[in-house]
Amino acid sequence: MKKKALLLGAILAVSSSAYAKEVLPAVEEVQETVIIAEVTPEPLIKSVTVGQSLEVDNTSGKKNIGEDVIFMNTAELSTENWDYTIGAGKVFSSDTHSREGGLYDRGTSRMELQAIRNFDNWFLGIKVQSNDDYDRWYLRTGYDYGMFSGWMDAQYYSQEKNNEDYGRIEIMPFNVTFGPIKVGYYLDYKDYTGKGQVMDNGVLEKSADHQLRAYAPLYNGEKLDLSLEYRLGLHNSMDYSNLKKDEGYRVYKDFNYNAMIINANYALNDSFDIYGYYRYDISKFEAKDGTITNEDNGKYYGEFQIGWAYTF
């Protein structure tokens, strides 16, 4: 009996050992190959653009070439989130009938500095424009969510001589884009410090200009792009004090200011662009708080600019 029990125990032990060998898999060593990819860091400076521009502004009845001729040299530097601009140039007037005998006067110098911080759908920046007779300080912001966009320039003019300082806000708070066309409301508001700016007919304290503006592309080619901007004056107002007796002031009649601007850009290659625009305004004025004798003076206004830009 004992022999049978020993024999049975031996058989069970051998069977358990054989079963364990069948169930437990053999462990194999696996060698992993790790590939380290070299990551190239993003460049700190994305692009550098240099260029020059010439702008000629003129109102009917004034200089026969340009009451303001603006020549600027500019350099722009862009990083991942920042855009920096520096500009230097000259502002003068030009007339073939100049009393001084030349085609242009000595004019004034101009310097501009700007820094813009770009976020996902909006931006915030500052700009300083320094001229011989005034300085102009900007706080700039704007947003763009595709169909809806807007911008604002809050400005302060620090003037010399007998000119009063004033604050100015230019704003398009809400623009709507329908396909290729964008439409929005524009406000230009000025508020003079102190008692206001002394004019020939009184003291100007405030002014406001309300417009409707529309933008549309005209042509988009391989090298040439053309676009159009239209401005309709809705209402123009001015606040005067101490108006001289029987002397009024003028504003354009409601819906009687029209401006058309054609913008053009021609890409000679991937780096070099030639650009420009032409603007023409037609206004119909009316007298307020008195009579005026110069209603039609300055009813036409034009601007022309041409420039080039090279991007490294």
At which residue positions do the language-model features occur?
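Transmembrane beta-barrel strands of outer-membrane/channel proteins
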Residues: 50-56, 86-90, 126-130, 143, ...
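Repeated loop/turn-to-beta-strand initiation elements of outer-membrane beta-barrel proteins
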Residues: 81-86, 118-125, 146-152, 175-185, ...
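Cleavable N-terminal export/targeting peptides
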Residues: 1-51, 82-85
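Outer membrane beta-barrel transmembrane domains
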Residues: 109-111, 123, 210-294
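Detector for outer-membrane/organellar transmembrane beta-barrel domains
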Residues: 148-249
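Outer-membrane beta-barrel architecture
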Residues: 72-76, 112-116, 140-142, 170-175, ...
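Outer-membrane beta-barrel "beta-signal"
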Residues: 266, 296-312
